[in-house]
């Protein structure tokens, strides 16, 4: 994926971690878990997350975060998720995180 394409996706900041909200590489099993957590199918979850439904956004971030840390908890993500967690690449100084 090019750097310009990465700039199109929001980045969610939770503590000292950054998660690129690129839905294109979320697997079927991951979407199944998101549906189990939220009751929403993939398109509904994406739509709700884009409207800052924190249950949907938190579930997606949780799934992405689990790729790096199998011990991460959904409630820990939700407890640290707020409006200011949603950033663009221009707002951040560092590299674009990998999904």
PLM regions and their residue ranges:
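Charged interaction scaffolds used for protein-protein
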Residues: 1-20, 25-62, 66-99
């Amino acid at each position: 994926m090019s750097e310009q394409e990465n700039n199109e996706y929001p980045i969610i900041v939770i503590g000292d971690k950054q998660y690129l909200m690129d839905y294109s590489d979320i697997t079927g099993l991951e979407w199944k878990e998101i549906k189990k957590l939220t009751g929403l199918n993939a398109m509904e979850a994406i739509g709700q997350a884009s409207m800052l439904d924190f249950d949907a956004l938190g579930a997606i971030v949780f799934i992405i975060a689990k790729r790096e840390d199998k011990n991460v908890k959904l409630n820990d993500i939700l407890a640290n998720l707020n409006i200011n967690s949603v950033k663009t690449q221009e707002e951040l100084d560092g590299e674009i995180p990998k999904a």
